[in-house]
């Protein structure tokens, strides 16, 4: 019932927001144009309020000014349909099937969000290569089978020494722009997010650079336990794990997420300077390998 805000450019970015403030708009438009989905959403909003024990929208003034609102009755509820929609200009794919949904985004390091009821997963592909610290797709397309294909070319380069000795020994006063650059190699990263039975398949392909320690970062929110073939752990949101087991279950008393297969070829999970921080309050799981990998 909450609104997806990870791509917001406003004050509500990454906040937990419910559609309470839209109640009057749904009611007015639903009544005026006889739109059952809008009227059902009005009832669904109050179902959310009762379930979450949160304050109701401030609508008293509207009910006082419009007697027709006070006398109107509607019994239905809004039933969320399955859908998959790609907003090409924004670079966002939103999809829902049953009670799980997912979002894929271009130009975001947290490029994948997967919600299953009360549990949430965020995914990054991260590592250090020149000035780059994480994968941020430059392009995004939807293939014929519904797969989201994201791609980034990370340009490799470094400064060559000064051709002539600088007049100063102060690094910050040197004319760095006068130095020539050694270009290459480039790292190519492709990510494929494919709809699958009961969830999604994610494929990560790196190429062009050999031996760089990169990682797939999975941040879990709303979970209480993690279990694999060899361990079951209660979690509180501060844990950091590298998982090599074939399958990992992250769950609470209502919902669960199954992830796998795991792989762990190194323990370099912190990244270098300027690496992005972990998601606050989330359990962080890593799958790690050296480039190039698939």
Q: Model-found features: residue ranges?
A:
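Extended polysaccharide-engagement surfaces of secreted carbohydrate-active enzymes
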Residues: 1-238
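Beta-strand-rich recognition/accessory modules
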Residues: 219-221, 235-237, 242-294
């Amino acid at each position: 019932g909450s609104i997806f805000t990870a791509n917001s450019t406003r004050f509500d970015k990454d906040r937990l927001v419910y559609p309470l403030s839209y109640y009057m708009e749904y009611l007015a438009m639903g009544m005026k144009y006889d739109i059952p989905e809008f009227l059902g959403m009005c009832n669904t909003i109050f179902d959310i309020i009762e379930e979450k024990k949160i304050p109701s929208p401030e609508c008293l003034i509207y009910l006082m000014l419009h007697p027709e609102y006070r006398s109107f009755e509607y019994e239905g509820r809004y039933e969320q349909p399955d859908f998959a929609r790609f907003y090409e200009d924004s670079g966002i794919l939103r999809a829902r099937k049953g009670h799980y949904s997912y979002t894929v985004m271009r130009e975001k390091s947290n490029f994948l969000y997967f919600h299953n009821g009360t549990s949430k997963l965020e995914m990054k592909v991260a590592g250090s290569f020149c000035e780059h610290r994480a994968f941020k797709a430059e392009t995004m397309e939807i293939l014929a089978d519904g797969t989201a294909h994201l791609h980034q070319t990370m340009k490799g380069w470094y400064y060559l020494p000064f051709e002539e000795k600088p007049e100063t020994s102060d690094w910050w006063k040197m004319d760095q722009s006068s130095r020539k650059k050694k270009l290459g190699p480039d790292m190519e990263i492709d990510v494929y997010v494919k709809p699958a039975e009961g969830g999604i398949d994610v494929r990560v392909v790196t190429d062009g650079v050999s031996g760089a320690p990169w990682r797939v970062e999975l941040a879990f929110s709303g979970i209480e336990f993690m279990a694999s073939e060899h361990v079951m752990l209660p979690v509180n949101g501060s844990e950091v794990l590298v998982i090599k087991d074939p399958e990992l279950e992250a769950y609470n008393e209502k919902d669960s997420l199954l992830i796998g297969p795991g792989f762990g070829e190194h323990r370099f999970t912190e990244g270098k300077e300027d690496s992005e921080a972990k998601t606050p309050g989330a359990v962080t799981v890593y799958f790690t390998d050296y480039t190039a990998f698939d």
